[in-house]
Amino acid sequence: MSYFRWDGEDLILDCHLQPKASKDEFAGLHGERLKIRLTAPPVEGKANAHLLAFLAKAFGVAKAQVSLESGELNRHKRLRIHAPQRLPTLPGLIFPGK
């Protein structure tokens, strides 16, 4: 199992979120999930909104192209990124067919 899979042109990511970190960053793998550290606190959806904005910037898409599929109230989240324009340097992550 991998922390990502392609669904057509959409990238599905399984993440482990660490809110209230000192900086926003990809932090390697946490089991079979991509660990992401965010500065936002886990209150009133702030960490989720911050996560969507962070991923949109990292993958070169508009915020509307990143959606939370599951894990709204959990550290374990599944996200969909529609047609990413670029891929950050992450373990094993490549565009399909390459």
UniProtKB/Swiss-Prot annotation:
Coiled coil location: none
GO cellular component: cytoplasm
InterPro entries with a match to the protein in the record: DUF167, YggU-like_sf
Highest taxon of the lineage: Bacteria
Sequence similarity: Belongs to the UPF0235 family.
Name of this protein: UPF0235 protein Pmen_4153
